[in-house]
Regions:
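A general "terminal functional-core" signal
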Residues: 1-201
Length: 201
């Protein structure tokens, strides 16, 4: 919440919330996957109440569907929520979108990045949010529990893409929230590189 607030009052354009537990599986009346409170939904509610900010766009690139976030925000037309997961869904108003994650192929990183760009870029540009939130899980890396065959290149590429998307859609305002991932060796490899790219973009 503090990271989001610093963006909204103009102290910073981008912030990384190094959360110790997940949030996107916590819904209105359920929780799972070590997610007890939905950090993103709580931050949105706070920013609306404290700062009058209305429109938010979320890209969830955790390997698993953000079912809790969707449960809370499903009927909110001022939140664009896009998940790259194993599902395929578009709400009637186009603000809630699930796309199947690409699997296999010769270059999983490139396929994943192209999917993220194709599904999010045009939507967020048209939606014009006040703030973009990237729910960043690294559990899709090779060998983690959500293995999509991805490497460091995919996550660094996503960071570059999100900085550019935020710059075009909402004046660069981007909050990155750490999501799933279980291996400390991968966390040590990936997270510092992503933070560096977010800071240098």
């Amino acid at each position: 919440m503090e990271a989001a607030q610093k963006i909204c009052v103009g102290e910073v354009d981008r912030a990384f919330a190094f959360i110790g537990a997940g949030g996107h599986h916590a819904g209105r009346s359920f929780f799972g996957g070590y997610c007890c409170f939905n950090d993103v939904a709580i931050a949105i509610a706070h920013l609306r109440k404290a700062h009058g900010i209305r429109r938010f766009a979320i890209l969830d690139t955790d390997a698993h569907h953000g079912d809790g976030t969707r449960d809370i925000l499903q009927d909110d037309p001022d939140v664009l929520h896009v998940c790259i997961c194993g599902m395929n869904y578009v709400s009637a108003d186009g603000t809630k979108v699930d796309v199947p994650a690409p699997w296999g192929g010769r270059d999983p990183d490139e396929s994943y990045l192209k999917t993220a760009e194709s599904v999010f870029a045009s939507r967020v540009h048209a939606f014009r949010p006040d703030l973009i939130i990237w729910y960043f899980g690294f559990d899709g890396h090779q060998g983690d529990y959500g293995d999509m065959g991805l490497s460091l290149r995919a996550f660094v590429g996503l960071a570059d893409f999100m900085v550019g998307a935020a710059r075009e859609a909402c004046g660069g305002k981007l909050l990155t929230v750490l999501g799933g991932g279980s291996r400390t060796d991968l966390a040590t490899l990936i997270i510092p590189k992503v933070i560096a790219r977010l800071g240098n973009g």
